């Protein structure tokens, strides 16, 4: 019986548990023996394995996070640690490793594949910054978390004629901010592609306030407080000092913790099935993603050289009020 191991790596994302469950379901149907690695590459190096018989995923399918744990293990860049990780797998007769994570996790998998291990990567990150997939596992649910939270903030913002500045996750990718702005009818959004200094920010807000008595702005994380721009706390203070009451909200890890929604689960099921089919057909290491609502696969080199999606039109659309 062929064997596979599954691990989750990097930041957690809604749908990781469902991905593990779908992979297990399709693998067992193909007579594969399934192992789980606890806590990502850290567990792979430290030999922390459990079998699918030791963990009932039924109760975790709809839960956010990852029941087998995840971690960021920078020491894995050490070649000797990677060799030990491969040895741990080989001792169990495991030749196929499925990695659920983002670009950093993919780099670890590519390094393992160069040691003769078959690695299959699925895009697990809320940031939607994996170029080999139109949408990543966790993105749609994080977007729903943004919609729910912003809707609640809208009510109090409108009631008190205020400005609300809402910081959104996404690391260096603006997709959650742009898609979130469109999904919530935000007044405008600020991303790395259109960052505003204090004067520019105030000008945009006052333009919105010319036709309504409130303003809701989504801002990507990792923009303010660096590269010569003020912190968001300073932005808030600036507006307060200029007679515009301002609420500053960071949505933080609420964007990671929701139960995966329907479109998330649908796409996960397609990618999981495609992954197991590749394993059964003895494919070499591959990166799996979504394109036009279908699961697709690429070799590592092709995947790493795919271009980023251009969001210029969407950014202009959401910022119609201030252009």
Curated annotation (Swiss-Prot):
MF annotations from Gene Ontology: 6-phosphofructokinase activity; ATP binding; metal ion binding
Top EC group: transferase
Record's catalysed reaction(s): beta-D-fructose 6-phosphate + ATP = beta-D-fructose 1,6-bisphosphate + ADP + H(+)
Pathway info: Carbohydrate degradation; glycolysis; D-glyceraldehyde 3-phosphate and glycerone phosphate from D-glucose: step 3/4
InterPro entries to which the protein is assigned, alphabetical: ATP_PFK, ATP_PFK_prok-type, Phosphofructokinase_dom, PKF_sf
Cofactor(s), by name: Mg(2+)
Enzyme Commission number(s) from the entry: 2.7.1.11
Active site residues of this protein: 127 (proton acceptor)
Entry GO CC: cytoplasm
UniProt keyword terms in alphabetical order: ATP-binding, Cytoplasm, Glycolysis, Kinase, Magnesium, Metal-binding, Nucleotide-binding, Transferase
Localization, UniProt: Cytoplasm
GO biological process: one example: fructose 6-phosphate metabolic process
Signal peptide coordinates: none
Residues engaged in binding ATP: 11, 72-73, 102-105
Residues that, per the record, bind Mg(2+): 103
Protein family: Belongs to the phosphofructokinase type A (PFKA) family.
Functional summary from the UniProt entry: Catalyzes the phosphorylation of D-fructose 6-phosphate to fructose 1,6-bisphosphate by ATP, the first committing step of glycolysis.
Oligomer and partners: Homotetramer.
Full protein name: Probable ATP-dependent 6-phosphofructokinase
Organism annotation: Mycoplasma genitalium (strain ATCC 33530 / DSM 19775 / NCTC 10195 / G37)
Classification of source organism: Bacteria, Bacillati, Mycoplasmatota, Mycoplasmoidales, Mycoplasmoidaceae
Gene: pfkA
């Amino acid at each position: 019986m062929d064997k596979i191991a599954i691990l989750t790596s990097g930041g957690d994302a809604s749908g990781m548990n469902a991905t593990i469950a779908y992979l297990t379901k399709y693998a067992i149907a193909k007579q594969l023996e399934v192992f789980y690695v606890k806590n990502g590459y850290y567990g792979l190096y430290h030999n922390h394995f459990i079998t699918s018989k030791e963990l009932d995923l039924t109760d975790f399918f709809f839960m956010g996070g990852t029941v087998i744990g995840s971690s960021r293990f920078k020491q894995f860049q050490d070649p000797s640690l990677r060799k030990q990780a491969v040895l741990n797998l080989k001792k169990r007769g495991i030749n196929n490793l499925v990695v659920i994570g983002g670009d950093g996790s993919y780099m670890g998998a590519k390094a393992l594949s160069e040691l003769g291990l078959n690695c299959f990567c699925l895009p697990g990150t809320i940031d939607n910054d994996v170029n080999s997939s139109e949408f990543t596992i966790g993105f749609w649910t994080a977007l729903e978390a943004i919609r729910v939270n912003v809707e609640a903030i809208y009510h109090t913002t409108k009631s008190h004629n205020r400005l609300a500045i809402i910081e959104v996750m996404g690391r260096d990718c603006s997709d959650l901010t742009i898609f979130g702005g469109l999904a919530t009818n935000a007044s405008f959004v600020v991303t790395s592609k259109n960052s505003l200094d204090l004067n520019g920010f105030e000008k945009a807000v006052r333009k919105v306030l010319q036709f309504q008595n409130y303003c809701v702005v989504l801002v990507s994380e990792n923009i303010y407080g660096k590269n010569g721009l003020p912190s968001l706390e300073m932005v808030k203070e600036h507006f307060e000092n200029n007679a515009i009451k301002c609420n500053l909200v960071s949505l933080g890890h609420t964007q990671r913790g929701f139960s995966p929604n329907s479109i998330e689960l649908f796409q996960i099921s397609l990618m999981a099935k495609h992954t197991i089919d590749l394993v059964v057909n003895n494919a070499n290491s591959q990166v799996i993603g979504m394109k036009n609502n279908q699961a697709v696969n690429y070799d590592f080199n092709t995947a790493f050289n795919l271009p980023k999606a251009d969001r210029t039109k969407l950014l202009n659309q959401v910022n119609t009020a201030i252009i």
